[in-house]
From Swiss-Prot:
PANTHER family xrefs: DEOXYCYTIDINE KINASE, DEOXYNUCLEOSIDE KINASE
InterPro entries tied to this protein: DCK/DGK, Deoxyribonucleoside_kinase, DNK_dom, P-loop_NTPase
Residues involved in substrate binding: E55, Y88, Q99, R130, D135, E199
EC number, UniProt record: 2.7.1.74, 2.7.1.76, 2.7.1.113
Name the record gives this protein: Deoxycytidine kinase 1
Any GO molecular function: ATP binding
Keyword rRNA processing found: no
Principal EC category: transferase
Organism: Xenopus laevis
Location of the active site: E129
Length: 265
């Protein structure tokens, strides 16, 4: 495995007051339908010095749901392929392709966001909806263990992931992780509620395996990775079994916990 690149601090230009502030990079992690998309939208509205990078779902599904800087059509989208649906329908054929493209599109979106609106912020925070680490150690590894990737594909994926991180990883290295913790049963209910067509056939067993991996990595902290700094990275765990989409009091409580967490970084 490649050695992780040395940590490099990314500075934004000096603010009007003359202060130069480093952008804090926080990843929001959690199972499918744990509430990440809802949560990052709440975060974006909570503080003008906070910005978010949502998962580039439209890139994976060929759905131009909204016009923003993360959702422009690419050549692969124009080809008409719904890669997410293809992966769910035939994982043993498309897992390697999907995981490679999912990570690539995530890196592209996150790098682009670093040059965004936070340049003038005093205390800028950029929240990523998932990271390149969960791409590899949660989702891709789970597909390999389920024999949806063969040994050769898994070896190639890891080599590719190592190289991509050697080139761009320092710019995406995290200052902290927020783990949205929800039991698989809640996640499955939310899958049905949000009605994303590609996900309607997801079995409980799949969510249970992903939950176990998230718990091992972020709760018990026993999952070993090739990135040493992750072993000591600060983690805030938020219980999101209770629905918070329309619960203002719950939202405010979560935001306060995030603010307290950020103050320690």
């Amino acid at each position: 495995m490649a050695t992780p690149p040395k940590r490099i601090c990314i500075d934004v230009p000096a603010s009007p007051s003359g202060n130069k502030c480093k952008v804090k990079r926080i990843s929001i992690e959690g199972n499918i339908a744990a509430g990440k998309s809802t949560f990052v939208n709440i975060l974006k509205k909570a503080n003008e010095e906070w910005d978010v990078v949502p998962e580039p779902i439209a890139r994976w599904c060929n759905i131009q749901s909204c016009k923003d800087e993360f959702e422009e059509l690419t050549t692969s989208q124009k080809s008409g392929g719904n890669l997410l649906q293809m992966m769910y329908e035939k994982p043993e054929r498309w897992s390697f392709t999907f995981q490679s493209y999912a990570c690539l599109s995530r890196i592209r979106a996150q790098l682009k966001a670093l040059g965004g609106k936070l340049k003038e912020a005093e205390n800028p925070v950029l929240f990523f909806e998932r990271s390149v680490y969960s791409d590899r150690y949660i989702f891709a590894s789970n597909l390999y263990e389920a024999e949806c990737m063969n040994e050769t594909e898994w070896t190639v994926y890891q080599d590719w992931h190592d190289w991509m991180n050697s080139q761009f990883g320092a710019d995406l290295e995290l200052d902290g992780i927020i783990y949205l913790r929800a039991i698989p049963e809640k996640c499955l209910n939310r899958v049905y509620t949000r009605g994303r067509e590609e996900e309607q056939g997801i079995p409980m067993e799949y969510l249970e395996k992903l939950h176990y991996k998230h718990e091992t990595w972020l709760h018990h902290r026993t999952l070993r990775t090739d990135f040493e700094y992750l072993q000591e990275i600060p983690i805030l765990t938020l219980d999101v079994n209770e629905d918070f989409r329309d619960n203002k009091q719950k939202q405010e409580s979560l935001i306060e916990k995030v603010k307290e967490f950020l103050s320690t970084l």
